[in-house]
């Protein structure tokens, strides 16, 4: 679907009155009972959907941040396709109710305190930050209660008053005649938009909405042991509520960047290290990379290719219990030489002859690394 602002032909900072005027004009133009073009009905539905989203501060805030994906089929959004023909035509021309009333009547908006929406923030962190945790500063766009009017939406010194059109109930009834008979339709009050109150003198700072969109700096604590997909909840840092309602929460979804040498399997760290055939045969002590930095690892004499050695307590801290840590498992890659010097070849041939002289029944290295070095079969 096209951008909602483009559908209504308004700018992204358009106020409520501008949106309403644009919607009424386009609803008259594309109403399927008037406009018989094949695409008129679909366009009429799109216009209605755009107005429903942008006329509500909460859904407008989500749309501005995340687009159509941020709406997620929000419950309570009326389906413009359910609008009745002649009744809607009456509303469109006389009251501007189009898109608000379904075939069974309008659903009133909640007039009391309304909790703000929860927000999502995606954050990428380094491998080491996921292991040991860190405090990070982020900037989030969200709705805050207008500090000029304290969320009332009214200019300082004034306040909301009971809507004279609906008497404060948020709904109006209209009787009309059609070729099919007379009927009464209940619809959202066009004057107060279902709230039961009107603001004659709106706050200039928030255009009467009671909330303003701002970018806020937050410092969040990333605990040790998090992983990709971990969700952190920051209470009260979502969008501000309406009419004194509580704010929603902020949910931070983490993605952990890969490490050039280390991999993760739960709380176990996996890595590989290359050793020479002489180190594998004779044993050695080498330096390996761990999340704690370089650490000494003992290569036992006679280590076979693809052997796995373990460094205890060098893995990932357990989320919620950072004292408990996993292990690091290191796969050993034994590198055999492609080319040998004459001296090396002579020594190896001498060693191979020494082992052959002992006889196969006494040969303890007739498989694995020695077999590969001396061309023997196990």
UniProtKB/Swiss-Prot annotation:
Listed CDD domains: DnaJ, DnaJ_C, DnaJ_zf
Domain J: 3-67
Cofactor, how bound (note): Binds 2 Zn(2+) ions per monomer.
SUPFAM superfamilies cross-referenced by the UniProt entry: Chaperone J-domain, DnaJ/Hsp40 cysteine-rich domain, HSP40/DnaJ peptide-binding domain
CXXCXGXG motif repeat start-end pairs: 146-153, 163-170, 189-196, 203-210
UniProt entry tagged with the keyword Cytoplasm: yes
GO CC annotation: cytoplasm
GO MF annotation terms: ATP binding; heat shock protein binding; unfolded protein binding; zinc ion binding
Family: Belongs to the DnaJ family.
NCBIfam families assigned to the protein according to its UniProt record, in alphabetical order: DnaJ_bact (TIGR02349), PRK10767.1 (NF008035), PRK14293.1 (NF010886)
Protein name per the record: Chaperone protein DnaJ
Originating species: Prochlorococcus marinus (strain MIT 9313)
Biological classification of the source: Bacteria, Bacillati, Cyanobacteriota, Cyanophyceae, Synechococcales
Gene coding for it: dnaJ
């Amino acid at each position: 679907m096209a951008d909602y602002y483009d559908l209504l032909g308004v700018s992204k900072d358009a106020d409520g009155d501008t949106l309403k005027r644009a919607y009424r004009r386009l609803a008259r133009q594309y109403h399927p009972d008037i406009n018989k073009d094949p695409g008129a009905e679909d366009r009429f539905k799109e216009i209605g959907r755009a107005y429903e989203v942008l006329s509500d501060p909460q859904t407008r805030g989500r749309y501005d941040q995340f687009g159509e994906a941020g709406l997620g089929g929000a419950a309570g959004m009326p389906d413009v396709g359910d609008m009745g023909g002649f009744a809607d035509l009456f509303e469109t021309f006389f009251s501007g109710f189009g898109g608000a009333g379904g075939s069974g009547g309008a659903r009133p908006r909640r007039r009391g305190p309304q909790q703000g929406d929860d927000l999502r923030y995606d954050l990428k962190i380094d491998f080491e930050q996921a292991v040991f945790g860190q405090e990070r500063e982020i900037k989030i766009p969200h709705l805050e209660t207008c500090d000029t009017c304290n969320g009332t939406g009214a200019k300082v010194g004034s306040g909301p008053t009971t809507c004279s059109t609906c008497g404060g109930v948020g709904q109006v009834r209209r009787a009309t005649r059609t070729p099919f008979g007379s009927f009464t339709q209940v619809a959202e009050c066009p004057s107060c938009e279902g709230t039961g109150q009107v603001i004659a003198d709106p706050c200039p700072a928030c255009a009467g909405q009671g909330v303003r969109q701002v970018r806020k700096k937050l410092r969040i604590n990333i605990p040790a042991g998090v992983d990709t997909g971990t969700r952190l909840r920051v209470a009260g840092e979502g969008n501000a509520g309406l009419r004194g309602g509580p704010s929603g929460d902020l949910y931070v979804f983490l993605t952990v960047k890969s490490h050039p040498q280390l991999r993760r399997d739960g709380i176990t760290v996996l890595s590989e290290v290359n050793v020479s055939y002489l180190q594998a045969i004779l044993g050695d002590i080498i330096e390996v990379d761990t999340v704690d930095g370089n650490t000494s690892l003992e290569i036992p004499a006679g280590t076979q290719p693809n052997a796995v050695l373990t460094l205890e307590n060098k893995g990932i801290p357990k989320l919620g219990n950072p004292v408990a840590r996993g292990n690091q498992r290191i796969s050993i890659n034994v590198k055999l030489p492609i080319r040998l010097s004459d001296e090396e070849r002579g020594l190896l041939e001498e060693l191979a002859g020494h082992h052959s002289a002992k006889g196969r029944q006494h040969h303890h290295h007739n498989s694995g690394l020695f077999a590969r070095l001396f061309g023997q079969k196990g």
